[in-house]
Amino acid sequence: MTNIRKTHPLMKIINNALIDLPAPSNISSWWNFGSLLGLCLIMQILTGLFLAMHYTPDTSTAFSSVTHICRDVNYGWIIRYLHANGASMFFICLYIHIGRGLYYGSYMFQETWNIGVLLLLMVMATAFVGYVLPWGQMSFWGATVITNLLSAIPYIGSTLVEWIWGGFSVDKATLTRFFAFHFILPFIITALMIVHLLFLHETGSNNPTGIPSNMDMIPFHPYYTIKDILGILLLILTLLTLTLFSPDLLGDPDNYVPANPLSTPAHIKPEWYFLFAYAILRSIPNKLGGVLALLLSILILVLVPMLQTSKQRSMMFRPFSQLLFWTLIADLLTLTWIGGQPVEHPYIIVGQLASILYFLLILVLMPTASIIENKLLKW
């Protein structure tokens, strides 16, 4: 008799995706982050669901309802902080996952890569609308500043902003619709994630060498299930350590002050995971230019497969490209730091130089280095 997991219509799908899936025998721990992202998504949906049971999306009670969750709901404090810090873990895994894709040339699976970029945009949108919900000072002013950027769009800008606000300022209507978006987006992300996996399983996984591994595959279970469990345990340990020892480490103290449209915080800044893009936005002394640079800083990922000039897929055997890749990482860390600093003398110029270098590395320097490496292969 054939095994039920190979014949049952539903079990068959799970079997082909998680059990009998042929996987390259040499994929490293950098390939763990896909499953960790799935775990983060499940965790965020579950903690978010329990938070939504007690939260009220109304300007007069939103802040109080979050306080009520932390003080009066059984284990409400840990659910709230797991959700807030879970978002940070989500972005850490996301950025490492993208970095892995860039380093090892996984972007050559174009459909998988493009859906991945779409997933990134969706997760960023979800995190942004979610940050508005506690209705603290940074929630309110962050929402005001970022939605206001749309007014830079010629002709329809101001109408668009008022349409998103549902009025003439960020108010009750804005909070209600942001809560609705924050609830629906994770389910759209889940659907996209399934499509992402569908396209990945059409081609099979890449591996650190970038060389096809069709002749050397091993079953996903037990090898990579065990490996993933180790990653999951480390992720949960990190998240629990952060949540139980310093839950507010990555948050902004200003968000413990209820939203007040009459008082602007000294420094308006988003959560740490948006700071690199925020720094690029601020580096351009023109509203429309800044908005375009902000968009391009993310959408440039779509161009990466088209900029592939190397004969080798992975950077494993390309020292020049490796140097430029790590320069890009250092540049992104610099931008993240600049985004959190006030707009003052040394920071402005450093931010502008880091922004120029970011685009220069991806669009010019890395493709050029690849061409030079191709020539060196002939020596």
UniProtKB/Swiss-Prot annotation:
Question: Quick one: which residues bind heme b b562?
Answer: H83, H182
Main subcellular location of this protein, as a coarse class: mitochondrion
GO molecular function, one example? metal ion binding
Cite the PROSITE patterns for this sequence. Answer: CYTB_CTER (PS51003), CYTB_NTER (PS51002)
According to its UniProt record, which protein family does this protein belong to? Belongs to the cytochrome b family.
Q: How does it assemble?
A: The cytochrome bc1 complex contains 11 subunits: 3 respiratory subunits (MT-CYB, CYC1 and UQCRFS1), 2 core proteins (UQCRC1 and UQCRC2) and 6 low-molecular weight proteins (UQCRH/QCR6, UQCRB/QCR7, UQCRQ/QCR8, UQCR10/QCR9, UQCR11/QCR10 and a cleavage product of UQCRFS1). This cytochrome bc1 complex then forms a dimer.
Protein name listed in UniProt:
Cytochrome b
